[in-house]
């Protein structure tokens, strides 16, 4: 168990405090309120690594095997549709997410330096942002297919590559602003340092801007994009008459639902944590304990999105369903 920072006055203004026992008779007259401030520290709560590490290993193996299988299925035929190309990129991004899981596993047994903390943060947020951008791209492609007649040409394939490079660069740019403010900090009572946002070295406005920009650009605006374009698609499909419209609607709803189910809770608590770090929400031990416990857990659950997309493909692939059911019948 690791101890967090106190909710009252800080005992030491330096980011790496010493742990010598205070002498109550030297240079200072300790009263009851000072003693209360020393002993009433908010103790951070975290899951035991005996629980977290096995879950991460299982998730890592599942994502690797599942996405390798899905990647081979998608590459069996020539890639002619942009939706297939996006699914391939999702598989590759899931392998990048596996690197995030490896960092999380190692973090439970090793002490990261500030440079490694920044690298870990970049890897994690590039995975998150690129995953969100791919879902938005898939949404836009579906909207184009429903509302317009889009031809598959060589020029379009060049555009796919250009869009992919642009989205990767944008994901790196957005992740860098988060990583630049992360440091390896050893707080009062901690056995070893951990990767944290060091708000003491930054202004309140900068802390707030980082918290808001990451959540707005990474979640709220893409979510608004999904709601508008998928809403237009659903309205168009609902009025149309063709056999496969139910399958298309089911696919769209599954992709959006899976993303909201996996990343939605993490972004909500991350936004609250940003407001707390910036001082816009009054600190309390119960709130800090809840955020300290739930954010790593929800981050782990969010990374499960890379494995759940395999199930989305299975549920939406009628050919695979027929083969699966025929195997059960035998």
Swiss-Prot record:
The record's disulfide annotation reads 117-195
InterPro entries on file? CCR1-9-like (IPR050119), GPCR_Rhodpsn (IPR000276), GPCR_Rhodpsn_7TM (IPR017452)
Q: Which UniProt keywords apply?
A: Disulfide bond, G-protein coupled receptor, Host membrane, Membrane, Receptor, Transducer, Transmembrane, Transmembrane helix
PROSITE patterns attached to this UniProt entry: G_PROTEIN_RECEP_F1_2
Q: Which domain of life is it from?
A: Viruses
- Record localization: Host membrane
**UniProt entry tagged with the keyword Zinc:** no
Q: Name one GO cellular component term.
A: membrane
Similarity comment: family membership: Belongs to the G-protein coupled receptor 1 family.
Q: What is the protein's name according to its record?
A: G-protein coupled receptor 74
What is the native source organism of this protein? Equine herpesvirus 2 (strain 86/87)
Q: What is the lineage of its organism?
A: Viruses, Duplodnaviria, Heunggongvirae, Peploviricota, Herviviricetes
Q: Which gene encodes it?
A: 74
């Amino acid at each position: 168990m690791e101890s967090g920072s106190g909710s009252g006055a800080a005992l030491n203004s330096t980011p790496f405090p010493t742990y010598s026992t205070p002498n109550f008779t030297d240079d200072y007259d300790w009263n009851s309120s000072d003693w209360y401030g020393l002993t009433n520290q908010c103790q951070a709560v975290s899951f035991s690594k005996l629980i977290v590490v096995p879950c991460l290993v299982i998730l890592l193996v599942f994502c690797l095997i599942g996405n390798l299988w899905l990647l081979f299925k998608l590459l069996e035929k020539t890639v002619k549709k942009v939706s297939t190309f996006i699914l391939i990129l999702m598989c590759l991004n899931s392998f990048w997410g596996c690197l995030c899981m490896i960092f999380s596993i190692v973090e439970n047994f090793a002490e990261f330096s500030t440079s490694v903390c920044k690298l870990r943060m970049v890897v994690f947020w590039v995975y998150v942002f690129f995953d969100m951008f791919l879902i938005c791209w898939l949404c836009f492609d579906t909207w184009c297919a429903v509302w317009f007649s889009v031809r598959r040409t060589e020029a379009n394939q060049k555009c796919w590559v250009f869009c992919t490079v642009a989205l990767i660069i944008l994901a790196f740019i957005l992740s860098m602003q988060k990583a630049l403010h992360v440091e390896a900090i050893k707080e009062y009572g901690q056995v070893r340092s951990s990767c944290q946002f060091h708000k003491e070295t930054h202004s309140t406005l900068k802390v707030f801007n980082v918290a808001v920009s990451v959540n707005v650009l990474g979640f709220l605006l893409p979510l608004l994009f999904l709601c508008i374009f998928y809403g237009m698609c659903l309205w168009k499909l609902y009025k149309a008459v063709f056999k496969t419209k139910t399958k298309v609607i089911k696919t769209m709803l599954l992709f959006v639902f899976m993303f909201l189910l996996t990343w939605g809770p993490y972004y909500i608590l991350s936004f609250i944590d940003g407001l707390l770090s910036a001082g816009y929400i009054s600190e309390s031990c119960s709130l800090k304990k809840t955020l300290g416990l739930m954010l790593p857990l929800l981050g782990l659950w969010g990374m499960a999105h890379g494995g759940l997309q395999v199930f989305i493909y299975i549920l939406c692939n009628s050919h695979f369903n027929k083969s699966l059911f025929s195997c059960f019948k035998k």
